[in-house]
């Protein structure tokens, strides 16, 4: 199979993975309007072509939280990554490390902090939720710090899980889910051998280190579902500051006032994100939310963005709309499921090449030169959010 784009990896992942796993990462909340809009809105951002600019000394390098990145991209925290390839977090982290960009380990990763961190040359980032069990949160923060994690990504848009209808149809949840997953695995022997049999243990490593070994993955998921905390407030973040003195990034910001609150709190960064369309369907795409947030806090706090990014052009678009760096989620999961570390490394190479083409043809020699001037019109001005059509497309 010829791989030339994220869409090729998506198609390959759909063939490789049991449906319950493919649709878990590919799907979103409710009717998936926001999921689709994440991609569609970003694709409508028109780049401004410039010529005869002598682009021979182009550079993608940037700095974030005193770390040098080879390009303004980091791998986002993705739960159950180790179910998409054997010890998937280790493989994805290795690809990011070799590329010179950060890898973010999810709270609900299969591989624990202690398995992933020692394999890397650069410090990884760690993502954490606010949970009712504050003992677990403190334990996770202490372990992340001991392992040398440099940056905490604090996810705040999940006080309760979103309703993901596709999961009930795919076998991730719903009636007879365990039996359906079993037969799906039987019908996908490559995955069953590589991950199902040889990728064990199939637990949530960061949680099992705290709770001990449960009887099955469902036990972890049940514990986690009962621990999401709808009472979350800025006071919880103040408590976390007692145990974490490194850079803290607040993930899940879609409103300028929340961004201002993050600045007032003293956060080091925010992620403009709708959780990849997996939480509240019908909210703004990240591309639509980003310009107003950048207008409110640009220069006061580092701005990261995710949701809908599929290629290097999308990275340039997000930066032109106001982001300093972007996070890749689904795109790298598709590549990981297809070809492990090699797939993720190849995807990152593709994104780098696409960024270089986009920057060369828009006249931006460095990341700092990508701005609103790189666009024909900003998305919010060229297509008002209230008038944007709802149309079908690939999952975001």
Swiss-Prot record:
The active site is at residue 275. It comes from the Bacteria. CDD domains: alpha_hydroxyacid_oxid_FMN. Signal peptide: none annotated. GO terms for biological process: aerobic respiration; lactate metabolic process. GO terms for cellular component: plasma membrane. GO terms for molecular function: FMN binding; L-lactate dehydrogenase activity. Its EC number is 1.1.-.-. FMN binds at residues 106, 127, 155, 251, 306-330. The keyword Chaperone does not apply. It is found in: Cell inner membrane. Its main location: membrane. Residues 1-380 form the FMN hydroxy acid dehydrogenase domain. It catalyses: (S)-lactate + A = pyruvate + AH2. The keyword Membrane applies. It is a peripheral membrane protein. Its cofactor is FMN. Pfam families: FMN_dh (PF01070). Keywords: Cell inner membrane, Cell membrane, Flavoprotein, FMN, Membrane, Oxidoreductase. Substrate binds at residues 24, 129, 164, 278. PANTHER family: L-LACTATE DEHYDROGENASE, S -2-HYDROXY-ACID OXIDASE-RELATED. Belongs to the FMN-dependent alpha-hydroxy acid dehydrogenase family. Catalyzes the conversion of L-lactate to pyruvate. Is coupled to the respiratory chain. HAMAP family: L_lact_dehydr. This is L-lactate dehydrogenase. The lineage of its organism: Bacteria, Pseudomonadati, Pseudomonadota, Gammaproteobacteria, Enterobacterales.
């Amino acid at each position: 199979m010829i791989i030339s784009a994220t869409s090729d990896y998506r198609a390959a992942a759909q063939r490789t993975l049991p449906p319950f796993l493919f649709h878990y990462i590919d799907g979103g909340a409710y009717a998936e309007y926001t999921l689709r809009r994440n991609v569609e809105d970003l694709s409508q951002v028109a780049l401004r072509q410039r010529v005869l600019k002598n682009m021979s000394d182009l550079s993608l390098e940037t700095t974030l939280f005193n770390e040098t990145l080879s390009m303004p991209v980091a791998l986002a925290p993705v739960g159950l990554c180790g179910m998409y390839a054997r010890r998937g977090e280790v493989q994805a982290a290795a690809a990011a490390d070799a590329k010179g960009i950060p890898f973010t380990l999810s709270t609900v990763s299969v591989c624990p902090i202690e398995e992933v961190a020692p394999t890397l040359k650069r410090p990884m980032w760690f993502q954490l939720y606010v949970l009712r069990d504050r003992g677990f949160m403190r334990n996770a923060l202490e372990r992340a710090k001991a392992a040398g994690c440099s940056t905490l990504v604090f996810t705040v848009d999940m006080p309760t899980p979103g309703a993901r209808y596709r999961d009930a149809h795919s076998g991730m949840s719903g009636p007879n889910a365990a039996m359906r997953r079993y037969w799906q695995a039987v019908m996908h022997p490559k995955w069953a051998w590589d991950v199902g049999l040889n990728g064990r243990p199939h637990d949530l490593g960061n949680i099992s280190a705290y709770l001990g070994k449960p009887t099955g993955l469902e036990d972890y998921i049940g514990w986690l579902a009962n621990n999401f905390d709808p009472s979350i407030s800025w006071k919880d973040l103040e408590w976390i500051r007692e145990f974490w003195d490194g850079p803290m990034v607040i993930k899940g910001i879609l409103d300028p006032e929340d961004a201002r609150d993050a600045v007032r709190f003293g956060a080091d960064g925010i992620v403009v994100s709708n959780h990849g369309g997996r939480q509240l369907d019908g909210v703004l795409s990240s591309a639509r939310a980003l310009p107003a947030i950048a207008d409110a806090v640009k220069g006061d706090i580092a701005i990261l963005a995710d949701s809908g990014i599929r290629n290097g052009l999308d990275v340039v678009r997000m930066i032109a709309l106001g982001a300093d760096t972007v996070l890749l989620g689904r795109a790298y999961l598709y590549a990981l499921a297809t070809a492990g570390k090699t797939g993720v490394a190849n995807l990152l190479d593709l994104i780098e090449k696409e960024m270089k083409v986009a920057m060369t043809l828009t006249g931006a020699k460095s990341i700092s030169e990508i701005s609103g001037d790189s666009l024909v019109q900003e998305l919010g001005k060229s297509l008002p959010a209230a008038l944007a059509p709802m149309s079908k497309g690939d999952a975001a």
